[in-house]
Amino acid sequence: MDANSINSFFLIGALLTAVSVLLSPMSSRLGIPILLIFLAVGILAGEDGPGGILFDDYSTAYLVSNLALAIILLDGGMRTRVASFRVALWPALSLATFGVAITTSITGMMAAWLFDLHWLQGLLVGAIVGSTDAAAVFSLLKGRSLNERVGATLEIESGSNDPMAVFLTVTLIAILANVDTEMSFSFMFISFIKQFGLGICLGLGGGWMLWKLVNLSKLADGLYSILVLSGGLIIYAASNKLGGSGILSIYLVGLFLGNKPTRGRHAILNVLDGMTWVSQIGMFLVLGLLLTPSDLVDILIPGFALAFGMILFARPVAVWISLLPFKSFSSRDRWFISWVGLRGAVPIILAVFPMMAGLPGAQLYFNLAFFVVLVSLLVQGASLTTAARLAKVELPPKPLPVSRSGVEIYPSSEWEVFVYRLSESKWCIGEPLKRLAMPDGTRIAAVFRDDTLLHPSGSTRLEAGDILCVLGQEKSLEALSNLFSQAPENKEVQRFFGDFFIETDVKLADLAPIYGLSLDNLADDMTVADLVVLQLGANPVLGDQFQWQSLHWVVAGLYEGKVTNVGIRLPTEHSL
């Protein structure tokens, strides 16, 4: 490649990236996933688009996509709270294994019938599109206030279901490439356990080693993120090299680092946030360039049938069967999880495997995977907000600070500065600072008014528009935000928790005469907390709901895993 070609490459790459960034606000206005914007830019720049760029290098696309996916999973793991595993780990693993297998089987049979394929070829198509995509799920769920059980299940599933899809895809390619070779069940089982086992061991072990290395190292501030990124990629590559799941390993590395006091954690997350955006843009641009839309014309009708068959039948069946042992999921929860079976880059990456293996019909598999991804992003991704509202899994937006940043007092410092802007509706307006019930271990470090830094004392009275800089830790964030912040207004969602609230230590016997409750066969000293456990099980989450004796009960407050208060919605005909 000469200097002119290199400059042309830089020019085109930078131009496409800039166009993708500038067009990204269109996603919210049009109600479509931002990933689809990036993909569309790549398609328009490609062979059939006005850009006319001829790109058919599957090896390069495979390299770029795997690198991008690894970075996205590392970032996603660091932002996942391990506390969510309490309610979501086993359901997510069930979806990541049995769910993928069921989706693969049903989708595979549909593909074999629709495209007149051998049943093994159909199963290969099912395996390629069988897993949800971490990049798509993390991107579309980011910033949404969903029921913790539902949101965490979807995120953990998307980060852990790729090993099953890769295992099925690689196994089926090996069978189709060597039709005379018999593969025993024990061989396939061992291969599956190896992928998961090595992926988990290397991810957790490597994550621990990387965490120790980061905290023991004394580097320039900007180098910690590079160390984490390079260390994560080393573990990702080593896991793949040894026959494990690199995708699972790097997700667990991020999970480990994100839930430990790590030196420079906030700076690392800030850098990874930018790297994740670059990865998403680069990955979907390259995949868009790889597609020739005219190749999809021949599979248009059966392709739609396959995509909607998977969305409306295969995925829901897989979800309902996989979640049968978990009674805490309501029908609405299961429906929403079924709908958010988003496909993205992973199916397209897996579709490159048959191309690189030289299998007959590989181009058809690739085109089908791309078509299913397009339909999934357009239909499921664009309707995510509506689906969350209909399923009633969207919670009121949490009050949050305007910004937050870490304070590196010592290597593993957990101190942060939270910045709040006071609105006129806050009760603390006009009150002196000494009257504020600040959480323990927090302090107002600075007050800004009209771009002027004040020297606050106990008698300083707060005014609307004041900007407060509060020193504290994440454990105090909720209390501080309730005190100073204001969640975006959404009356329909705000009514989510009910007409009024009661504490869970109240006895049902005290409520019975007020609301006409029948307490037959219930203990006289039974409390609201006991009722919640009876109805929802031992691990309720914020937003869980149940109907009991004409009243609608909603979990409205939690502290250290225990319900502190519930909201009650009265029947419309009830009057106080």
From Swiss-Prot:
Compartments annotated for it: namely: Cell inner membrane
Matches recorded under SUPFAM superfamilies: FAD-binding/transporter-associated domain-like (SSF56176), TrkA C-terminal domain-like (SSF116726)
The keyword Transmembrane helix is annotated on this UniProt entry = yes
| MF terms in GO | flavin adenine dinucleotide binding; potassium:proton antiporter activity
Q: Which GO biological-process labels does this protein carry?
A: cell volume homeostasis
User: How the protein sits in the membrane?
Assistant: Multi-pass membrane protein
Q: Where is the RCK C-terminal domain?
A: 405-486
Q: What is its main location?
A: membrane
Transmembrane regions? 6-26, 34-54, 58-78, 87-107, 109-129, 163-183, 185-205, 219-239, 242-262, 271-291, 299-319, 335-355, 359-379
Catalytically driven reaction(s): K(+)(in) + H(+)(out) = K(+)(out) + H(+)(in)
Record's keyword terms, sorted: Antiport, Cell inner membrane, Cell membrane, Ion transport, Membrane, Potassium, Potassium transport, Transmembrane, Transmembrane helix, Transport
List the record's Gene Ontology CC terms alphabetically.
plasma membrane
Entry function: K(+)/H(+) antiporter that extrudes potassium in exchange for external protons and maintains the internal concentration of potassium under toxic levels.
The record's annotation in PANTHER family points to: K(+)_H(+) ANTIPORTER NHAP2, NA(+)/H(+) ANTIPORTER 1
Q: Which family does it belong to?
A: Belongs to the monovalent cation:proton antiporter 1 (CPA1) transporter (TC 2.A.36) family. NhaP2 subfamily.
Which HAMAP family does the entry mention? NhaP2
Q: What is this protein called?
A: K(+)/H(+) antiporter NhaP2
Q: Which organism is it from?
A: Shewanella baltica (strain OS195)
